[in-house]
């Protein structure tokens, strides 16, 4: 929800200070609208609404589909599959693919089909070696912060029990970032 070229770490006051990332704009606008609705309900009705903005969340029942997942679940799954491939642990690879097929390739596929689909997602056996090459993606320059979903829930409960909306809005803050906020 923060501007595309927002300084790091992101601070609450950076909201609405620049252009949004075009690929994320509809999501960001919806989130910003929710924050503004809570803010204006407080101003008009003195409702005790506090908006929070989590960092990248992960946890149980996350989406580990390499075609549609977010960053951390994809990284975890790719690392797991690469480790299994390097250890020649075909049973674990097949079990993983039976639970979450990749482009309709399940654990019932041949070793060659599995190796081909894994290489499409940058998990490859190094030729004439037992080693595996794993490429995540990008340059490695973007900074990301991750938070376990139960920690997010704990933060929300803490805020509900210890912060009044008046405290927040009197500081001219419309929402609270949940995360470490450090480089």
For the regions a language model picked out, list residue spans one by one:
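Alpha-helical substrate-binding/gating segment
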Residues: 43, 57, 73-135, 144-176
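Short aromatic/basic micro-patch
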Residues: 51, 146, 183
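Catalytic helix-loop patch of NAD(P)-dependent Rossmann-fold dehydrogenases
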Residues: 1-58, 62-73, 80-81
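Heptad-repeat alpha-helical coiled-coil signaling segments
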Residues: 62-63, 142-144
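Conserved S-adenosyl-L-methionine
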Residues: 179
């Amino acid at each position: 929800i923060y501007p595309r070229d927002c300084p790091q770490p992101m601070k609450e006051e950076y909201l609405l200070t620049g252009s949004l990332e075009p690929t994320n704009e509809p999501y960001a606008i919806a989130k910003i609208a929710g924050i503004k609705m809570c803010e204006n309900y407080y101003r008009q009705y003195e409702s005790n609404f506090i908006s929070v903005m989590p960092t990248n969340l992960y946890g149980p029942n996350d989406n580990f589909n390499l075609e549609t997942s977010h960053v951390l679940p994809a990284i975890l799954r790719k690392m797991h599959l690469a480790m299994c491939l390097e250890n020649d642990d075909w049973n674990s690879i097949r079990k993983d693919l039976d639970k979450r097929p990749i482009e309709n390739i399940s654990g019932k596929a041949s070793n060659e089909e599995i190796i081909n689909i894994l290489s499409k997602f940058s998990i490859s056996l190094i030729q004439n070696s037992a080693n595996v090459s794993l490429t995540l993606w990008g340059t490695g320059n973007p900074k990301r912060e991750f938070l376990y979903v139960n920690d997010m829930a704990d933060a929300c409960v803490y805020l509900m029990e210890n912060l009044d909306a008046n405290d927040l809005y009197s500081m001219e803050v419309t929402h609270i970032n949940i995360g470490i906020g450090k480089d």
